Every structure is written in C-alpha cells, then in structure tokens.
C-alpha cells in the first residue's frame, strides 16, 4: 500500500522546521510523498491577519521545489468558506482511496483535537501524527489524552520527535519587523522572495 502524508499550515512564512518535519515523516512512516497544503481560511485563525494566500503558496513552492517527494496543493486556498481539515482529507481520500493517509500536525493541537469538526470521520480517513516542537516528552496530561482518544475513537495517535529547531513563523515575522537577521531560519529562495516583496515589515 502507498503511504502519503498531508502537512497543512498557514506557512506565513514556511521555514526550516516545516521542512525538517516533512523529511522526518518521510523516513519514519515510509512515505512516498508529503503534500504541503497552505491554509485557506482556518476557523481558529479567522481574526488573525495573514499574508495573501497566493504569496504563501509561492513561498512553499520555492521551499520544496528541489525535493521530488514533496508537493504542494492549492486545494484549501481555492476552496470557498472556512478551511476544515475534514474537507481537505476527504478530498484527497476520494482522489486516492487506496492510499494510506497520514495527517501531520503540531503538539499544540492535541489539547483541542476532540473538538475538531467531524473528528470521528477524520480518524476514519487518516492516521494522526503529532510532532513536538522542542523534543517530545510524554507528560501525564498527554498520556491521558492519548488514552482518552484511543478509548473514544479506537485510534492510536502517533507521535514524532523531529528534533525540530526552535523556529516559528511568528518569531520570524517579529524579527523581520525588528530588523533582525532571519536568513538562517528558511531556505535561501524563500528569504530572497521575502526581501524582494518587502514582506512582514
């Protein structure tokens, strides 16, 4: 069976930690492909100011262009209305029903995962992979959450310690506003694109 993963996010901007997560997932789960999906209008970020979707899409495209096992989809940014994870996963599952799908998201989502729209259906469509930003440690509350999800949905949450650098898109945007160096946080072409388009000033 073919294994593929979806890695969603606002990618505002995309940075090296995103790339590291994708590479780690490729090896860990024997994936044929990781599909990067820039978020359209996620319900939990409605009020947050975001860089226009076509610009975020272009940055992701530049960041992954040399890796044949990475691809990008504009499904969410072209879809009308709110960008629900269920709708995205359903779309890809219907396109490739025989593929074994993984959905990769951050550890911070674990606390409100059970409140996601159509979470039952999401667990039926894919394997849920949680990655840690600072080196994964199974704290007591995380262990309880895992057990709760296993009992309720009969699905095991997979965890991935990707040895991720301490990088976030918010940190990058703030450093740019402050006139600080950020080139080492992202692929060179993304950095040049940000400079050329005077982003995050």
Swiss-Prot record:
Name the InterPro entries for this protein. Answer: Cyt_trans-like (IPR004821), NadD/NMNAT (IPR005248), Rossmann-like_a/b/a_fold (IPR014729)
Q: Which UniProt keywords apply?
A: ATP-binding, NAD, Nucleotide-binding, Nucleotidyltransferase, Pyridine nucleotide biosynthesis, Transferase
Instruction: Write down the chemical reaction(s) this protein catalyses.
Output: nicotinate beta-D-ribonucleotide + ATP + H(+) = deamido-NAD(+) + diphosphate
Cite the source lineage: Bacteria, Bacillati, Bacillota, Clostridia, Eubacteriales
CDD domains attached to this UniProt entry: NMNAT
Any one GO BP annotation for this protein: NAD biosynthetic process
EC number(s) per UniProt? Answer: 2.7.7.18
Which cysteine residues pair off into disulfide bonds? none
Task: Name the Gene3D superfamilies for this protein.
Answer: HUPs
Answer whether the UniProt record assigns the keyword Transport to this protein: no
Q: Which organism is it from?
A: Clostridium botulinum (strain Hall / ATCC 3502 / NCTC 13319 / Type A)
Which pathway does it serve? Cofactor biosynthesis; NAD(+) biosynthesis; deamido-NAD(+) from nicotinate D-ribonucleotide: step 1/1
NCBIfam families (alphabetical): cyt_tran_rel (TIGR00125), nicotinate (nicotinamide) nucleotide adenylyltransferase (TIGR00482), PRK00071.1-3 (NF000840)
Q: What does this protein do?
A: Catalyzes the reversible adenylation of nicotinate mononucleotide (NaMN) to nicotinic acid adenine dinucleotide (NaAD).
Q: What is this protein called?
A: Probable nicotinate-nucleotide adenylyltransferase
Please name the GO terms that the record assigns under molecular function: ATP binding; nicotinamide-nucleotide adenylyltransferase activity; nicotinate-nucleotide adenylyltransferase activity
Quote the SUPFAM superfamilies the UniProt record gives: Nucleotidylyl transferase
Q: What EC class does the entry list?
A: transferase
The family database entries (Pfam families) matched by this protein are listed as:
CTP_transf_like
